């Protein structure tokens, strides 16, 4: 009889705990927004994302390596991204980020980051 009563108490506590946390928001980690690199192009070449978004560039070329070179104020260039590799960055400030490929400046991309 004691075990049965204890089991009911544990069940009641579990139900109450579930109801307590049921109304709380759950933060879901968003998947990165992916930009492919193939045929010496960024695909898509222009994207719009919210502050806090991670953008991931994936090199789908067979032989060529590329980089992501941000050309605006405080410009920055990623390490080389070899075929089959990727590089990512979190955009934590709103603005327009224009980039090219360091070794292939004809490759152009743009990211619009909004609140």
Region annotations inferred by a language model:
Residues 1-6:
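Short, Lys/Arg-enriched N-terminal segments with co-localized hydrophobic residues
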Residues 7, 18, 23-115:
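Extracytoplasmic copper-binding redox domains, predominantly the cupredoxin/blue-copper superfamily
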Residues 8-14:
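Sec-dependent signal peptide recognition
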């Amino acid at each position: 009889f004691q075990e049965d009563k204890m089991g009911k108490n544990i069940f009641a506590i579990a139900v109450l705990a579930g109801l307590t946390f049921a109304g709380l928001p759950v933060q879901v980690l968003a998947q990165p927004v992916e930009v492919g690199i193939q045929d010496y192009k960024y695909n898509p070449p222009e994207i719009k994302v919210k502050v806090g978004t991670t953008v991931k560039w994936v090199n789908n070329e067979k032989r060529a390596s590329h980089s992501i070179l941000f050309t605006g104020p405080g410009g920055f260039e990623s390490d080389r991204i070899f075929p089959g590799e990727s590089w990512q960055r979190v955009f934590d400030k709103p603005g327009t980020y224009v980039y090219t490929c360091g070794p292939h400046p004809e490759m152009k991309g743009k990211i619009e980051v909004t609140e």
